[in-house]
Amino acid sequence: MSSVDYARVEKAIRFLDENAGRQPELREVAEQVGMSEFHFQRLFRRWAGVSPKRFLQFITSKRAGELLTHRSALDASYELGLSSPSRLHDLMVSVNAVTPGEMRSGGAGLEIRWGVHPAPFGDCLIGITDRGVCELTFLSEEELREGVEELARRWPAATLLEDQRGTAQMVEKIFNRRQAGDHVEVLLGGTNFQLQVWRALLEIPTGQVTSYGDIARSIGSPL
């Protein structure tokens, strides 16, 4: 990606983050970076791995989780720029696999099955509901117990069940993606430099070895 494209995507992400409360349309975001909707959508998806709309949903969902600790679903919906609590419900289920009511109550009536499994980045703690993944954390062996305790603190009213077999199937689905073009959507948070490095790492072909120097040169910061 050129430095111009990088700057455009960076500006778009900042705009979405600062204006999430009014749910800007694709046209408005594209205008901010001087592009047509069609070309901006393609550029953003190529760089971020998700569409601008989906990225905005991630931001909105995170803020919804914070608001629901002390606000009603109706109040949270309007503050987030959503037209009704039903839209908030659909958003939370789509992104977090839990309803606003379940999040606000700390998981009352919710069953979360969890397990610990080896993954490409070390051991992972995964939690799933009947709707999908609600927790995925990478931990060292020493941190695993603390991770389970943190999951229980986050969902104090939920029923937590250890289910190694059931959660293993989900981990397999997430990480063993062998078909060409298959990918996992990930929302990353970090400094501009960190995002550049992560992007460079993602572009290394499977099975190919590279050096720190090559990565540094690829992002314009030679060692």
Predicted regions and their residues:
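Basic nucleic-acid-binding alpha-helical/helix-turn surface characteristic of O6-alkylguanine DNA
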Residues: M1-L80, S86-L223
